[in-house]
Structures are given as structure tokens and as C-alpha cells.
Swiss-Prot record:
Family recorded in the similarity comment: Belongs to the autoinducer synthase family.
Organism whose genome encodes this protein: Pectobacterium parmentieri
Gene (name only): expI
The keyword Transferase is annotated on this UniProt entry: yes
Keyword tRNA processing attached: no
Protein's name according to its UniProt entry: Acyl-homoserine-lactone synthase
Gene Ontology BP, a term: signal transduction
Keywords: Autoinducer synthesis, Quorum sensing, S-adenosyl-L-methionine, Transferase, Virulence
Record's catalysed reaction(s): a fatty acyl-[ACP] + S-adenosyl-L-methionine = an N-acyl-L-homoserine lactone + S-methyl-5'-thioadenosine + holo-[ACP] + H(+)
Length: 217
């Protein structure tokens, strides 16, 4: 059963941090060839600090997917690393979080979960549920065009705030991701259209994708 939960940087174990940063290196350096710094086979940066919280999607104690969340009042990639990619960036004051370093380990996902789980959409729902549980008003993130397409396909009513150009001369987008009840409903319906999971569990945090069981007798 896939479970998604949050862990603050200060509570991140050495074992789990090594697994996370190794998977990030395999995703962002090896597969996507981003301009990221890697040490000892791991990718981490100045934003992996006490202000960071990580969402983990785990099956059988193995990390399948993850992202890093930072309240926008703290230093983050939008106002730091990615700022030069845009002509202007104006994040409003309020209870907002920045999401970065989102990935799904495709090999692990296929091996452990098979091809039937919409893991990205499940993780988007987790982001909504986490944000609602903590009282946040929304999420800001910067994505590539392929990730923009994946987000749109999920049905999540995202909005493009700004467009920019990366160091690889590829289009990137600053997005606002709403975390209201409508967003939650849309993602729950998309994930559970075949009634595979216990729906009440899909609106909770932490998030568990508990399969429906056949009635006995």
C-alpha cells in the first residue's frame, strides 16, 4: 500500500536522507542533466536545511516519490536559484509554500507498484492534503514544459503566473497550485474513478491508498 507522509529536515534520518539525495541525483543529474551539484553520488543544495519539509511516497520502506516544501517567507529556489530565469517574480505575502525537487522513481514505481497506479496524480493529491492540514493557502512551484503537461492532465486547476527561460534555453513556468476543496475533489475523482481505494482515506493526512476489499459472505 502506497503511503505518503511528511518529514521535517530536522527529523530526517541519515539513512533516509542518503536514499533521498541519491535518488535526486539519479533523477536531476543523471536522467534530466540539470545543472545541479552532486557530492558522493548525492544531490543536495543550500535549501536542504531546517526550513525544509519533505513529502515521501513509500511502499515497503522504499521511497517511490518525493518533493521538498519550504514556506515562501524563507529562502527558496523561486526567489533564489530560479529567480534569474524570469523577468519578474512577485510572490504575495501569506501562508504559501514553495515546492521543488519533485520526482517519481519510475523504475521503482514500475517494479513495486506496476503500471496501474497514477503515482504523479497521487502525489499531487498528497500535496493538497498536506497543505490543507497545515492551513496553507496554496503552493508555488517552477516546472518544465513536460511537467506542466503532467499537471494539466491531472485535472488540477493550476495557473501560470510567469514564463521564463532556463539555463538550457528551455521554457520554464512559475505556477500557482490551489489547495482548496475543489482541487482535492478533482484529484480524488481522477485517482478513484474505478473505486479502487477507500475514498475517505484519500482526503486524510498522512495519505494512504488503502485498496477496497471485497465484502465477505
Amino acid at each position: 500500500m502506497l503511503e505518503i507522509f511528511d518529514v521535517s529536515y530536522t527529523l530526517l534520518s541519515e539513512k533516509k536522507s542518503e536514499e533521498l539525495f541519491t535518488l535526486r541525483k539519479e533523477t536531476f543529474k543523471d536522467r534530466l542533466n540539470w545543472a545541479v551539484k552532486c557530492i558522493n553520488g548525492m544531490e543536495f543544495d543550500q535549501y536542504d536545511d531546517d526550513n525544509a519539509t519533505y513529502l515521501f511516497g513509500v511502499e515497503g520502506d522504499q521511497v517511490i516519490c518525493s518533493s521538498r516544501l519550504i514556506e515562501t517567507k524563507y529562502p527558496n529556489m523561486i526567489t533564489g536559484t530560479f529567480f534569474p530565469y524570469f523577468e519578474k517574480i512577485d510572490i504575495p505575502e501569506g501562508k504559501y509554500i514553495e515546492s521543488s525537487r519533485f520526482f517519481v522513481d519510475k523504475a521503482r514505481s514500475k517494479t513495486i507498484l506496476g503500471n496501474s497506479y497514477p503515482v504523479s496524480t497521487m502525489f499531487f493529491l498528497a500535496t493538497v492534503n498536506y497543505s490543507k492540514s497545515k492551513g496553507y493557502d496554496g503552493v508555488y512551484t517552477i516546472v518544465s514544459h513536460p511537467m506542466l503537461t503532467i499537471l494539466k492532465r491531472s485535472g488540477w486547476k493550476i495557473s501560470i503566473v510567469e514564463q521564463g527561460m532556463s539555463e538550457k534555453h528551455e521554457r520554464v513556468y512559475l505556477l500557482f497550485l490551489p489547495v482548496d476543496n475543489e482541487s482535492q475533489d478533482v484529484l480524488v475523482r481522477r485517482i478513484n474513478h474505478n473505486q479502487e481505494f477507500v475514498e475517505s482515506k484519500l482526503r486524510e493526512w498522512p495519505l494512504s491508498f488503502e485498496p477496497m476489499t471485497e465484502p465477505v459472505g
